[in-house]
Amino acid sequence: MSLPDLPFNPAHCLINGTWRAPLDGQTLALIDPSNGSELTQIARGQSRDIDASVEAAQSALNGEWGSKTALERGRILTRIGQLVLEHVDLLAELEAHDVGKPLTQARADAIALARYMEFYGGSADKIHGETIPYLGGYTVYTLREPHGVTGHIVPWNYPMQIIGRSVGAA
């Protein structure tokens, strides 16, 4: 079993909008769990690659991304969801190969990723600091604390769903 043709090099890291080799050049084998065969080599990023990613993300947050309105950011997330749906078959095939799950389940995970992006895209300009009332005798308030740049560790068995839940919300 082999991977379909990809529009990027899986042995590269996506940093600051550019696919590039890991700084130390290391890769690791992506193994098909259904039969133990090597599907491809993928980037084995190290701390310097993470540092470059964080620096690029912080620069975007302090620049163009951070200056976008909530409505604009929401539209971008919604567009990501649309793109996922446009490529759902490819993403499902990749997910099935990567984690060894049935294609129907992998497809459902890709659709869930799209739906998370649509949900967070739609809610981006709906958060206004309102506090939901609670029981009498309690003081409740809303404190907005932006996270800034965040890192996400994604488990091997549900990568698309976890990306949707965590990256979409961030």
Outline where the language-model segments fall.
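A short local loop/turn or secondary-structure capping micro-motif enriched for an aromatic residue
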Residues: A29-L30, S47-I50, M160
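Conserved strand-loop elements at the edges of beta-sheets that form or border functional pockets
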Residues: D32, R44, R144
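Conserved small-residue-rich beta-alpha loop and adjacent elements
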Residues: E130-A170
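Glycine-rich loop-to-alpha-helix module at the N-terminal edge of alpha/beta enzyme cores
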Residues: S37-I127
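Short glycine- and Lys/Arg-enriched binding-loop motifs that mark or flank ligand-binding interfaces
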Residues: C13, A21, A96, E118, ...
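Hydrophobic face of amphipathic alpha-helices that form TPR/SEL1-like repeat modules
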Residues: M1-S34
